[in-house]
């Protein structure tokens, strides 16, 4: 079975930013997924450079994606370009968080 980008995004919905209580996909923190199976690269950002949960979020992303069938290596690529902003959140996240 081969996986698609959508499968990776769906798997990442279980990874939450504990400060905001929302998943990294709805928060707009996952900028992209590149599949070169068995390697998956996740390009992502955090809500701030000083995010205390950054290492935990990165580890959880690696763990959940590496559990997908066909994935042998997960690379996480933290970027600050473009900088994250609340406008990147899904409409549901904006509603829940009052934006």
Regions found by a protein language model. Give the residues of each.
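Domain-level signature for proteins that mediate thiol-based redox and metal-cofactor handling
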Residues: 1-99
């Amino acid at each position: 079975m081969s996986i698609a980008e959508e499968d990776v995004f769906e798997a990442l919905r279980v990874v939450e930013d504990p400060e905001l209580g929302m998943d990294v996909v709805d928060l707009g923190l996952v900028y992209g997924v590149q599949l070169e199976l068995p390697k998956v690269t996740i390009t992502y950002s955090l809500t701030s450079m000083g995010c205390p949960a950054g290492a935990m979020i990165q580890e959880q992303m690696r763990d959940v994606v590496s559990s997908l069938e066909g994935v042998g290596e997960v690379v996480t690529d933290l970027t600050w370009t473009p900088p994250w902003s609340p406008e990147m959140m899904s409409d549901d996240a904006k509603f829940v968080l009052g934006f």
